[in-house]
Structures are given as structure tokens and as C-alpha cells.
């Protein structure tokens, strides 16, 4: 008798994706982050669902409903902090996952890479809207500042901002629609993630060497399921440590003050995972220029396959490109630090230098270095 997992129409799909999937035998722990992202997404949807049962999307009661969740709801505090810190874990895994794709040349799978970029943008939009929901000072002013950036759009800017706000300022209409979008977007992300996986399984996984692994593949289960469980254990250990011992470490103290349109916080800044883009935005004195740089800081990822001039796919055997990659990583960490600093000397100058370096590495230095390495291969 044939095994049901190989014949049943529905179970067969799961079998071909997670059990009998032919996988390269040499993929390292950097390939763990796909499954970790899936886990983070499920965790966020579940905790978010329970939070939505008690949350009120009204300007007069949103802040107190969060307080009620933490004080009165059974284990509400852990659900709230798991959701908040789960978002940080999500972005940490996202950045590592994207970095791995860049390092090992996974961007040559165009459909998978482009859907990944759409996923990144969607997750960023979802996280931004989620940050507005507690209706603290940083929620309100963050929403005001970021949505106001759209007013830089020529001709239709002001109308666009007022359309998004649902009025002439960030108010009840804005909060209600942000809650609606924040609820629906994770399910869209889930659909996109499935499509991402579908396209990946069309071509098969990349591997650290960057060469075809068709001659040497092993089944996903039990080899990589056990390997993924190790990564998952470490992720949950890190998340639970953060949630139970340092729940407010990554948050902003200003968000424990109810939103007040008449009182502006001294330093308006988003969550840590947006700081690199926020630093790029602030480094350009012109409003429209800053907004374009902000958008390009993410959309530049779509150009990476076009800028790939190397004869080798992976950076594993290209030391000069490796150096540039780690300089880029350090540059992003510098931008993250600058984004959290006040707009004053010397932070402005450091931010501008780091922003120029960020775009220069991707657009100019990486393709040039790859061409030099191609020449060196002939020697």
C-alpha cells in the first residue's frame, strides 16, 4: 500500500514541501532563518489575535485597553510583551535572512528575491501600524511624522496625507483604519510567504558554495527538521529571556505616556528596526529627497541582481567582496545607532557619511570589486 502522505492531495503538498523535499546536503545554519520567520509569523498572528479580543481602537480608550490587558487579563502581560518583542525577533531574523541571500547570491532566483522584498515592505508597514495602536506619545507622534512624509509627494501630497488620516490630523479615524490594516496584513503576509516558498521550491535551495547541488541532495526530514528545531529552541530561549526579564528593553519610555497632540516628545524616533532607514531619511536636508532616499534604502535590493557582475554566485570564495559585505553590515549598525540619536553635531555628519557609504557600496563598490575579482581569477 502506498503511503498516504504521498497520495493524499492535501498531505502530498505538505510532504513535498517539508518532508521529502530534496535539499542540498551542505546548507549551513544561515538557512535556518526561513523556518524561524515562519514561526515568528505564526506567533505574531496568535498573540495578536488574543490581543485584538481585548483591544479597543478608539482614541479615548486605546491606551487604557492596553493597560487593562496587562493588569486584568489572565496572562495578558505576557501576550502583550511576546507580541512586542516577537516583532523585534521577526525583524532580526528578516535582516539576517536578507543578508544571507545577499552574501550567498540567492538573489539570482529573481521571483523568490522580489517576493521577499515585497514581504519585507509589507512586514515593515504592518509593524509601523502596530506601533501606533497603543496610542502612547511615541505612537501618536511617530504616526504623525511618518504619514506626514507623504506630503512631500508633488501636487497631491496634502490630499494624500489627509486621505490616509481620514481628517486633518492623526485621530480616531486614523487609529481605527490602522487597526483594521494591522489585523488583515499578517494574513496577506502569510499568503506572500507561501508564494515565496512556492517559487523557492521551483528552483530548489541555494547552498554556501553557490554551485548546483543537484548531484548531492538529501530529504528535508529528518535532517533539516532537527536542525531547524535547534534554531527554533535558541530563538524561543532568546525571546522568552527578553520577554520575561527585559520586556521594555527595546521599547520607548515615552510610550507609557498617553498620546497628547499638544505636547511633542523631545526626540521622535521609531522602533529599533526602522532606525537605519530613519537615519537615511534625516541625513538629507530636503524633504522630498529624504523620502526618496528612505524608499530607495529598501527598493535598492531589487537592483542587486542587475548589479551582480561576479563570475561566482556566492561570496564564499571572494574575500574582497566579503570585506565589503561586512563593511555594509557595520554601516547599517552605525545607521541604526545614528537613527536613535538627536539631530545635532556630530551625529548629522556621521549619518550623512554612513548614508552615502550605504548606497555607494551597493551601487558602485560591490560591482567594481566583483569585476576586479573576475580579473584576479584569470591570473
Swiss-Prot record:
Q: Which GO terms describe its biological process?
A: mitochondrial electron transport, ubiquinol to cytochrome c
The cofactor required is: heme b
| Gene3D superfamilies the record matches | Cytochrome Bc1 Complex, Chain C
Q: Does Mitochondrion count among this protein's keywords?
A: yes
GO MF annotation, one:
metal ion binding
Spell out the subunit comment: The cytochrome bc1 complex contains 11 subunits: 3 respiratory subunits (MT-CYB, CYC1 and UQCRFS1), 2 core proteins (UQCRC1 and UQCRC2) and 6 low-molecular weight proteins (UQCRH/QCR6, UQCRB/QCR7, UQCRQ/QCR8, UQCR10/QCR9, UQCR11/QCR10 and a cleavage product of UQCRFS1). This cytochrome bc1 complex then forms a dimer.
- What is the name attached to this protein's record? Cytochrome b
Q: Which organism is it from?
A: Daubentonia madagascariensis
Amino acid at each position: 500500500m502506498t503511503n498516504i502522505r504521498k497520495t493524499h492531495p492535501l498531505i502530498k503538498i505538505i510532504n513535498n514541501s517539508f518532508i521529502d523535499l530534496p535539499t542540498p546536503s551542505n546548507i549551513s545554519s544561515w538557512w535556518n532563518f526561513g523556518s524561524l520567520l515562519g514561526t515568528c509569523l505564526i506567533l505574531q498572528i496568535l498573540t495578536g489575535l488574543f490581543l485584538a479580543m481585548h483591544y479597543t481602537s478608539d482614541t479615548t480608550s486605546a491606551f487604557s485597553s492596553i493597560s487593562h490587558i496587562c493588569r486584568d487579563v489572565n496572562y495578558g502581560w505576557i501576550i502583550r510583551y511576546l507580541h512586542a518583542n516577537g516583532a523585534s525577533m521577526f525583524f532580526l531574523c528578516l535582516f539576517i535572512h536578507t543578508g544571507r541571500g545577499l552574501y550567498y547570491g540567492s538573489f539570482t532566483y529573481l521571483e523568490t528575491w522580489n517576493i521577499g522584498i515585497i514581504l519585507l515592505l509589507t512586514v515593515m508597514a504592518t509593524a509601523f501600524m502596530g506601533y501606533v495602536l497603543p496610542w502612547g506619545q511615541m505612537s501618536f507622534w511617530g504616526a504623525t511624522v511618518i504619514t506626514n512624509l507623504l506630503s512631500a509627494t508633488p501636487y497631491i501630497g496634502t490630499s494624500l496625507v489627509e486621505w490616509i488620516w481620514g481628517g486633518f490630523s492623526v485621530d480616531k479615524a486614523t487609529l481605527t483604519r490602522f487597526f483594521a490594516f494591522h489585523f488583515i496584513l499578517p494574513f496577506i503576509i502569510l499568503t506572500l510567504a507561501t508564494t515565496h516558498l512556492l517559487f523557492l521550491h521551483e528552483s530548489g535551495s541555494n547552498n554556501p558554495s553557490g554551485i548546483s547541488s543537484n548531484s548531492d541532495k538529501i530529504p528535508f526530514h529528518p535532517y533539516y527538521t532537527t536542525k531547524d528545531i535547534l534554531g527554533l529552541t535558541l530563538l524561543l530561549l532568546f525571546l522568552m529571556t527578553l520577554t520575561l526579564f527585559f520586556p521594555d528593553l527595546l521599547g520607548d519610555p515615552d510610550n507609557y505616556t498617553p498620546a497628547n497632540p499638544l505636547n511633542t516628545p523631545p526626540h521622535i524616533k521609531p522602533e529599533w528596526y526602522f532606525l537605519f532607514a530613519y537615519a537615511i531619511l534625516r541625513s538629507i536636508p530636503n524633504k522630498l529627497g529624504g523620502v526618496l532616499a528612505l524608499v530607495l534604502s529598501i527598493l535598492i535590493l531589487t537592483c542587486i541582481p542587475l548589479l551582480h557582475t561576479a563570475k561566482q554566485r556566492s561570496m564564499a570564495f571572494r574575500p574582497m567582496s566579503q570585506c565589503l559585505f561586512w563593511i555594509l553590515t557595520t554601516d547599517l549598525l552605525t545607521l541604526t545607532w545614528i537613527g536613535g540619536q538627536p539631530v545635532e553635531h556630530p551625529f548629522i555628519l556621521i549619518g550623512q557619511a554612513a548614508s552615502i557609504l550605504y548606497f555607494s557600496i551597493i551601487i558602485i563598490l560591490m560591482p567594481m570589486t566583483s569585476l576586479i575579482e573576475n580579473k584576479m581569477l584569470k591570473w
